[in-house]
């Protein structure tokens, strides 16, 4: 679905619905950590709605194929009257028309199936006592969600979003916290960015914060249009510039001192103490990460620390207390972690 600037327009209700959340995510006297909190909250609480994203493609294709299917018989009858068409070609054309009919039916099934899937999901999640009320609430929520411009109230209620919803939510939170921000806009994608020391850092659905050049490389793009809100409601977006990827900002070198600094900060996050006393005979457990080395700088540092900490914690959960040490290293241009996990000597009796 093409991104229109109207899709990320805010209103009073959007700002009101996100004000409390913004206050919760605010980190005192540290705008960078506040932004990381916003991004981590979205990463942990909002799920990308592939159903909503796909349904627009289904509908678009359905309309195009449907128009072809509708006008084809008239065009074909006209061709038969004007031209001399052999029986073989007639059979081939009939077969093609039959295939188009099947494709049209399949895409119709896709649209209906996606709608019913979302309806059933929200029917199940509804807290209403009556089944009739559950059906009504599920239907209303589904229609609200798949609408082109979804309200933030619906996004926060359903915890489903696509890129423009993420951007709208991020913008509303940052507006409430008086943090100046920008929109990076493609025909099919939009993200939010902040400018620190004359350089753009991108907030795009998941941790970590990305340097704009690394973000462009990740998307396989060479340039992006940048806009800034003229007023608090994004009712007008002012074009700022067209940013072109700068290869000079894509360096995959990182010093051992920085790796040790990341290592120490991850240990603090996970409360790993006395790491120097770990058993070196323990075979490390490798944890691969998708964060490129070239994304590191002082601004992205803490967001990278949070990603690594979450990956390790999600792997070991409450057994994180048995992790005696970690080592951060480079692996094919990306960060990687060796986790030293020591199995306790005794297992508690389950009786």
Curated annotation (Swiss-Prot):
<dbReference type="GO" id="GO:0005886">
    <property type="term" value="C:plasma membrane"/>
</dbReference>
<dbReference type="InterPro" id="IPR007562">
    <property type="entry name" value="Transglutaminase-like_domain"/>
</dbReference>
<keyword id="KW-0472">Membrane</keyword>
<feature type="transmembrane region" description="Helical">
    <location>
        <begin position="58"/>
        <end position="78"/>
    </location>
</feature>
<comment type="similarity">
    <text>Belongs to the UPF0252 family.</text>
</comment>
<dbReference type="Pfam" id="PF04473">
    <property type="entry name" value="DUF553"/>
</dbReference>
<feature type="transmembrane region" description="Helical">
    <location>
        <begin position="91"/>
        <end position="111"/>
    </location>
</feature>
<keyword id="KW-1133">Transmembrane helix</keyword>
<protein>
    <recommendedName>
        <fullName>UPF0252 protein MJECL39</fullName>
    </recommendedName>
</protein>
<keyword id="KW-0614">Plasmid</keyword>
<keyword id="KW-1003">Cell membrane</keyword>
<keyword id="KW-0812">Transmembrane</keyword>
């Amino acid at each position: 679905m093409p991104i229109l600037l109207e899709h990320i327009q805010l209103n009073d209700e959007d700002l009101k619905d996100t004000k409390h959340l913004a206050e919760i995510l605010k980190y005192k006297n540290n705008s960078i950590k506040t932004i990381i909190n916003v991004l981590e909250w979205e990463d942990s609480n909002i799920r990308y709605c592939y159903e909503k994203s796909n349904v627009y493609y289904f509908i678009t294709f359905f309309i195009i194929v449907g128009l072809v299917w509708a006008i084809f018989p008239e065009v074909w009858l006209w061709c038969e009257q004007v031209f001399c068409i052999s029986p073989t070609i007639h059979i081939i054309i009939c077969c093609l028309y039959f295939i188009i009919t099947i494709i049209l039916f399949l895409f119709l099934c896709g649209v209906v199936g996606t709608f019913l899937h979302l309806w059933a999901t929200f029917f199940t999640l509804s807290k209403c006592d009556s089944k009739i009320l559950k059906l009504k609430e599920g239907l209303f929520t589904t229609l609200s969600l798949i609408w082109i411009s979804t309200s933030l109230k619906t996004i926060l209620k359903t915890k489903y979003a696509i890129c423009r919803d993420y951007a709208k939510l991020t913008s509303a939170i940052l507006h409430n916290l008086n943090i100046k921000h920008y929109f990076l806009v493609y025909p099919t994608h939009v993200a939010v960015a902040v400018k620190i020391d004359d350089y753009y850092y991108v907030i795009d659905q998941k941790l970590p914060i990305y340097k704009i050049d690394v973000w462009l490389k990740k998307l396989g793009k060479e340039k992006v249009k940048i806009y800034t809100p003229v007023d608090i409601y994004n009712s007008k977006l002012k074009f700022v510039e067209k940013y072109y990827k700068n290869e000079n900002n894509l360096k995959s070198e990182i010093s051992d001192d920085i790796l040790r600094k990341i290592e120490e900060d991850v240990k603090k996050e996970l409360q790993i103490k006395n790491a120097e006393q770990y058993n070196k005979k323990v075979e490390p457990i490798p944890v691969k990460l998708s964060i490129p080395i070239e994304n590191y700088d002082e601004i992205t540092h803490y967001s990278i620390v949070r990603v690594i900490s979450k990956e390790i914690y999600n792997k070991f959960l409450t057994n994180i207390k048995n992790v005696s040490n970690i080592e951060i290293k480079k692996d094919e241009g990306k960060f990687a972690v060796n986790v030293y996990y020591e199995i306790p000597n005794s297992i508690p009796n389950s009786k």
